[in-house]
């Protein structure tokens, strides 16, 4: 049975990822900054700390087989995702933990040129979104240069819709929207931990 650590496991998508892993009987660690948090499941180990602290990251990754990163953007620290991911990758290499699944966003990197003009305008006119995409771009560079068995997941706009039970990977069809349920994003991430189809690849997903 794989031991899995989820960074960002208390966020919108992260919580669902953790729930799905626990439902499979997995042993899960997750990091929280809330000192009063308590585990609600016998297979869930909560570590209190910050992803920017290397010692905390070392504690999280100790004896783990798979790392999942679903970090969110932090307005108070504009490079939390990239710096935190750099810490995670460094510790993974030191501890010989090789499998990494990292959540990014559609529009990051080379996918920017394929985005609708309306999307580009929205991002460029919003300083927070602009900073978030910059941080995601740096984060992806860290992952791609890591020599790990990585998968980068780029969802379209994540929405609170119910789980559809399916998703489209690396392509659009006429009947697809530029949105995806957060539950479907979480399911794809969970599916990826036992799937080699997207190792060292970027997977764009949408409904």
What would you call each of these model-derived segments?
Residues 74-100, 138:
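NAD(P)-cofactor binding segment of oxidoreductase domains
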Residues 4-24:
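N-terminal Rossmann NAD(P)H-binding glycine-rich loop of SDR-like oxidoreductase domains
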Residues 80, 153, 180-190, 201:
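Substrate-positioning beta->alpha
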Residues 31-36, 50-51:
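N-terminal Rossmann-fold cofactor-binding loop
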Residues 140-161:
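Conserved beta-loop-beta element that borders a ligand/cofactor-binding pocket
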Residues 110, 146, 162-167, 192-201:
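Glycine/proline-rich active-site loop of Rossmann-fold NAD(P)-dependent oxidoreductases
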Residues 65-68, 101:
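N-terminal Rossmann-like NAD(P) cofactor-binding module of classical short-chain dehydrogenase/reductase
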């Amino acid at each position: 049975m794989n031991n899995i650590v989820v960074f960002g496991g208390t966020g919108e998508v992260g919580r669902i990822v953790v729930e799905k892993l626990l439902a499979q009987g997995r042993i899960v660690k997750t990091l929280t900054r809330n000192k009063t948090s308590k585990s609600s499941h016998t297979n869930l180990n909560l570590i209190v700390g910050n992803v920017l602290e290397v010692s905390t990251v070392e504690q999280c990754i100790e004896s783990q087989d798979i790392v999942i990163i679903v970090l969110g953007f932090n307005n108070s620290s504009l490079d939390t995702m990239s710096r935190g991911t750099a810490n995670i990758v460094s510790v993974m290499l030191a501890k010989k933990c090789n499998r990494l699944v990292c959540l990014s966003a559609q529009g990051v990197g080379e996918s920017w040129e394929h985005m609708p003009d309306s999307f580009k305008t929205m991002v460029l006119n919003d300083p927070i979104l602009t900073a978030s995409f910059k941080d995601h771009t740096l984060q992806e560079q860290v992952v791609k240069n890591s020599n790990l068995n990585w998968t980068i997941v780029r969802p379209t706009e994540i929405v609170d819709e119910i789980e559809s039970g399916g998703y489209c990977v690396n392509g659009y069809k006429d009947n697809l929207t530029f949105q995806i349920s957060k539950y479907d994003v979480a399911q794809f991430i969970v599916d990826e931990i036992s799937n080699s189809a997207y190792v060292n690849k970027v997977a764009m997903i949408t409904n």
